[in-house]
Amino acid sequence: MILKLRRLEMRPRAALCAALWLSACTSVPLPQGTSLSSYAGMSPSTGILAKARLRVDPAPLLAAQTVRIVPTATQIGSSGFDPKDLALVANAVDRALCTDLSDRFQVVAPSLPADLIVHATVTDIVATNRTAAAGSVVASLGASVAGLGVPVPRLPIGLGGLAIEAEAVDKDSSQKAAMLWSRGANIITTKARVSTVGDAYSLSSAFAADFSRMLLKGKDPFKGMPAIPSMQRLRASLGGDPKYDACKAFGTAPGLPGMVAARFGLPPTWTDKGAAVSR
């Protein structure tokens, strides 16, 4: 009898968990832009949270030793976003790509030849609702002050998202890897920030990790176990100098001040100074 009651009690809990999970992420389309040299031969591949279509040529990627990064562009039409916010998101993509690719490749300056040339384009940004984000921040901080000791999920409304397409071409402009990628914020792992590009900014590093892994390993980045971050990645994420001077063009990560700002839901512009050189 007790077991039967427990089963009956668990059913609404399971239904609630399922409902929360379904509402935990915002859905972001996977648009195809016009910035890639080719969209042929791309196959669907889906991670736990991201949607993607990709094409990868393993042999030339694994043989490559140097890479050059072309600054990320935006191709989202009349969006209503502040140009400074868009530039910050684009630069965050570049900075993360530069750091992640440094694990195996030597990143060279724009004026130097490279085995691979990487460029990305932001094709869509789903705006973060600042009012909803502020409510989530207040609820989270209130729980901390009350000493509940339990993380409070974000409100499942007004979540933002990001869509990007990117490719790596060789010296002859022949495409060796390409990816269409999109991902929405979720109520568990994406911290609310009171900025229309708050979630897009946070998700920029997730895209960079997926795309870089494809180039580093020469295969679908969504298959297999995620790698442990290298020491140079950790150092750069904490605001340290990057491994290669070419990455200094994208500025340094906000580090600990940025983490504190994210905890309090402050806009990324408060702590991220953006590119070190004009784009």
Locations of regions flagged by a protein language model:
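Surface-exposed short loop/turn segments
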Residues: 103, 111-172, 246-279
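C-terminal motif of bacterial Sec signal peptides marking the signal peptidase cleavage site
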Residues: 21-24
